[in-house]
């Protein structure tokens, strides 16, 4: 039995999100949450919320036992990039790109 949770449009770089996602892929959910608690990255807090949501979905919608759940798949995909403009000297300008990403988590037995 598989249950999923999704978070889309997160203001986070894809590479930084994947760095944290690789730490918990295939682990039991209690071990994954423990790893995320002690990882000092911005992405860890974001991914922790998605994992907790997937656990709650599994418990509420499917009646799954939390102790047996594992993080089956977790992946971070690139989202839309917010493009901003920064004024510079002598009438010039620089572009600022603010990347977003989508986080997908699937938990199951």
From Swiss-Prot:
In the UniProt record, which is one GO cellular component term? cytosolic large ribosomal subunit
GO biological process per UniProt? translation
Lineage, top-rank taxon, reads Bacteria
User: What keywords appear on the UniProt entry?
Assistant: Ribonucleoprotein, Ribosomal protein, RNA-binding, rRNA-binding
In alphabetical order, the GO MF annotations are: rRNA binding; structural constituent of ribosome
User: Which proteins does it associate with, and in what oligomeric form?
Assistant: Part of the 50S ribosomal subunit.
Concerning SUPFAM superfamilies, the annotation shows: Ribosomal protein L22
Protein name according to UniProt: Large ribosomal subunit protein uL22
